[in-house]
Regions:
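Nucleotide-state sensing region of NTPase/ATPase domains
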Residues: 1-64, 68-80, 128-131, 135-136, ...
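Active-site donor-binding loop signature of nucleotide-sugar glycosyltransferases
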Residues: 52, 278-280
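Long, charged N-terminal accessory/stalk domains
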Residues: 56-58, 63-106, 110
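Conserved NTPase motor "head" modules and their coupling/switch loops across ABC/AAA+ ATPases, GTPases
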Residues: 103-114, 118-228, 237-256, 265-270, ...
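Walker B catalytic acidic pair
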Residues: 232-234
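Conserved D-loop beta-strand region of ABC ATPase nucleotide-binding domains
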Residues: 260
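Conserved short hydrophobic beta-strand within the ABC ATPase nucleotide-binding domain
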Residues: 273-276
Length: 286
């Protein structure tokens, strides 16, 4: 399968992108040149998604929120992806040593600390810049004083080096590294309680949408990225005032919208430039 397209970049420059998926793997091209990694393609074409399951960003564990945070960090600081690749490699080596109870566990600590602290600093910088956008978005969408707090993945009273030493015996017992940015989270709280414990499914969706909207507005202002936003079944879990809040916030975004739905909800965001219909597995213009 091959998908190609043309995007408008900085200063109204145009660039062609392409992705081809075969049995042997996935390849990508940017302006006719092979992309060495899919991260290059992702950086060239920023896409975010709001779909019916977006409430899981609030409801489920830290993995989803780390991915949400890192998506924005990568676009503001492109070198972040290299840090994460290095960290993942070192973490894998340390965990392998823990599983075999090898005496080389501590050999990996210095690298883990150095790269882990760099990742944490990048995430904290992003969160500081994001918070004003978050506060405006969550107020407009939910009307609730929901708070975001970055939890770095180890005790605030310890450096990462100290945490690794303190948890060494426990790490050996569990055979995995328990401190570091891979254990980080973004706590979502309302009046000091976990938002997932007090918000309805519809409210969780609006909070998760606010997290996404805040990201997009930050990227537009900070690095002049004009993202594409994919909306799938936007009215799911929403009705009345909540749906109107959602429509108002999304309509204010200065980005391309692609809306998919079984119902004519795309009209809620204004007259679409193009409309297509899926029929018998084929996409046809209307």
């Amino acid at each position: 399968m091959r998908v190609t397209g043309q995007i408008q970049g900085d200063r109204d420059t145009m660039a062609r992108l392409g992705v081809e998926v075969t049995r042997t793997g996935t390849t990508a091209r940017i302006a006719g040149q092979p992309a060495e990694t899919l991260a290059e393609l992702s950086h060239a074409f920023a896409v975010q998604v709001i779909e019916p399951g977006i409430h899981r960003l609030v409801e489920e564990g830290g993995y989803r929120r780390r991915r949400w945070l890192d998506w924005a960090v990568f676009r503001v600081e492109p070198q972040f992806v290299d840090l994460w690749v290095r960290y993942t490699r070192v973490l894998k080596q340390r965990n392998a040593a823990l599983k075999t109870q090898a005496p080389t566990v501590s050999v990996w600590d210095n690298d883990l600390v150095k790269v882990g602290e760099a990742i944490t600093a990048a995430r904290q910088r992003l969160m500081e810049r994001l918070l004003p956008y978050w506060q405006a978005a969550v107020a407009g969408l939910s009307g609730l004083p929901v708070e975001l707090q970055y939890l770095r993945g180890w005790s605030q009273e310890r450096t990462l080096a100290e945490a690794l030493i303190e948890l060494r015996a426990s790490d050996e017992l569990r055979r995995q590294t328990q401190a570091g940015p891979h254990r980080a989270d973004v706590a979502v709280r309302l009046h000091g309680r976990a938002a997932r414990d007090v918000l309805s499914r519809g409210q969780q969706k609006l909070v998760a949408v606010a997290m996404t909207v805040a990201q997009l507005r930050l990227l537009q202002d900070a690095v002049q990225i004009t993202p594409t936003l994919l909306l799938d079944d936007p009215a799911a879990e929403l009705d009345g005032e909540r749906l109107q809040r959602f429509i108002d916030e999304v309509a204010q975004l200065r980005c391309q919208l692609v809306v998919t739905s079984l119902h004519p909800e795309s009209q809620l965001f204004g007259a679409p430039e193009s409309t297509f219909c899926m029929d018998a597995g084929r996409v046809q213009p209307i």
